[in-house]
């Protein structure tokens, strides 16, 4: 048996993952906003059922990279890319990709909680209703399952018909996570999910992230290096649109290979 992470998952060699170990594979990805290139020749693999953190200075391209995984950048008229991203056996950067179907497989949670102006219940089942699910028993089971997975069930089980805006910001963010996982995606993208929350809510979300990987592959963008160290199994350091270093989190933070990485994590710049 190899080395174990704090929650007893074997460390993988992320430079040589097998297909069975890989959730997302990025190969020579370049992305442009108009004539400006913002991602440069990025290649790496995201392991299944682990938390992978993307860190780097503001404007380095980490959120842009994250949005490539569910093609959110397609919503920008001047954005184009080349290279390849695979989700399992499917090339998701192909022009024929069904983007709506992709976003059912790759859920996303943003920086600020964005519940819909609906009840707690209707927030959770929103995606299922879009898929045509009407069976009340199926919907009820999905609500309980998702809210339990988001560590919110016991706080709201008697308030499901209340407007979601009556929840605290931390509860709203967990509700948004529940909404994302209700449709049972394979991958969950988290774009600075705690940056707008207080310390107690942040801790709750961090604890949640470490449990979510039992069912999902999690990719996390964070400006908080301490958070990356606490919750992620693997970390990629992005600088000026380039992947500088990618390794298991403990190794990257304690024994970085690249001087740029060391300078960033020790606060010399960024």
UniProtKB/Swiss-Prot annotation:
Catalytic activity: phosphate(out) + ATP + H2O = ADP + 2 phosphate(in) + H(+)
One cellular component (GO) term of this entry: plasma membrane
Classification via Gene3D superfamilies: P-loop containing nucleotide triphosphate hydrolases
Cystine bridges: none
Membrane topology according to the record: Peripheral membrane protein
Keyword Metal-binding attached: no
Cell cycle found in the keyword field: no
EC code: 7.3.2.1
Family listed: Belongs to the ABC transporter superfamily. Phosphate importer (TC 3.A.1.7) family.
Functional description taken from the UniProt entry: Part of the ABC transporter complex PstSACB involved in phosphate import. Responsible for energy coupling to the transport system.
Protein name: Phosphate import ATP-binding protein PstB 1
Lineage, top ranks: Bacteria, Pseudomonadati, Pseudomonadota, Gammaproteobacteria, Enterobacterales
Gene name in the database record: pstB1
